Design a protein with these regions (language model features):
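Residue-level recognition of single "structural anchor" positions
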Residues: 1-329
């Protein structure tokens, strides 16, 4: 827009009625979202300015895409590309709304349900679900966490879930040919009065939680509760000069003995939870509470997606922002 046209536009704002002001504000917010996501995508191109087809870094500007992103033409092979070419988000038609979905996922407030977010964005719930899974696939790749000093370790548990498997539907439709699934649905224990399994069972999935006093944290789903599995998961995390604090589980004692690491066992009853004034596992207990609060609104995510949800929580705790996800895509 030319400068004199822009001044006329600003002068005309004083003639708007309240309804028109609301419409103008909504339009400006939409434009601001689009501008922000375009800036992040183009920043990604400036960091990696080589052609995704031939790898040559000689290019020239070649117009803009339908979504307003700068397009380039390779001066070597003649192919055109933009900041989204070859990225995970290359086929998203509304990158501005995708940025809103990322802010909902990684903001300070509790993430909204897929249905609530879809209503806000005016999209189908399955579109929002696919976007969420796409974002989780981007942030699931993490760097190795380095621990030092006093290291706390414990486990928390998550119910096994087959959400979306349709196995009970197929069984009810053809009970003669489709066998009954190995576990009743969790709702059947309440609605049909089935007796709940006491204590820990094979349907309780262990999640290893590790934290040190420097702020390093790790949540990792384990395939089972065997001591050997715990040892394999803990061994690469423990430096030689660390002090391991845990409960009395056998796996931790073996890890400490194998690595020659000092091991302090703390109790679970009042008066035994802190040893020598500084040895405790309150940091991982706090991590368990954060995990429970985070996972509760999802009503038990499918086990096949549990690792993605764990990484989602780690990303929120680490302060990863929406723009970091777009640049990493």
């Amino acid at each position: 827009m030319r400068q004199h046209d822009f001044r006329r536009f600003l002068n005309a704002l004083g003639d708007l009625n309240p309804a028109q002001i609301e419409q103008a504000q909504t339009k400006i917010m939409d434009l601001r979202r689009k501008t922000e996501v375009i800036s992040e995508i183009e920043a990604r191109t400036n960091q990696e300015n080589s052609c995704p087809s031939c790898g040559i870094d000689r290019r020239q500007k070649w117009g803009r895409t339908r979504t307003g992103i700068q397009r380039y033409r390779c001066q070597s092979c003649g192919k055109t590309y933009s900041g989204r070419t070859g990225s995970v988000i290359s086929r998203i038609h509304r990158p501005d709304l995708f940025l809103v979905a990322l802010r909902d996922m990684l903001g300070t407030s509790t993430p909204r349900s897929v249905r609530a977010l879809a209503r806000q964005l005016g999209l189908n719930k399955y579109t929002v679900w696919r976007w969420r899974m796409l974002a989780l696939s981007i942030i699931q790749h993490r760097e190795a966490t380095a621990f030092s000093g006093i290291i706390e370790a414990d486990e928390t548990y998550q119910r096994e879930s087959r959400k979306g498997s349709r196995e009970w539907v197929r069984h009810f439709a053809d009970p003669q040919n489709v066998p009954q699934p190995p576990r009743p649905r969790w709702e059947d224990f309440t609605t049909k009065g089935l007796k709940m399994m006491r204590g820990l069972s094979k349907w309780q999935l262990p999640i290893l939680t590790v934290a040190d006093r420097g702020g390093a944290r790790l949540l990792q789903r384990l395939p089972n509760r065997q001591s050997a599995t715990l040892e394999r998961a803990m061994e690469p995390l423990m430096p030689k000069d660390a002090v391991l604090c845990s409960d009395g589980a056998n796996g931790y004692a073996t890890v400490a003995a194998t690595g020659g690491i000092e091991h302090v066992v703390v109790g679970t009853k009042p008066g035994t939870r802190v040893t020598a004034g500084c040895y405790h596992i309150q940091n991982v207990n706090s991590l368990h509470a954060r995990y429970d609060k985070f996972i509760k609104p999802f009503c038990g995510p499918a086990t096949k997606n549990l690792n993605l949800y764990i990484r989602w929580l780690e990303a929120r705790l680490a302060g990863i922002g929406p723009t970091d996800v777009i640049r990493a895509s």
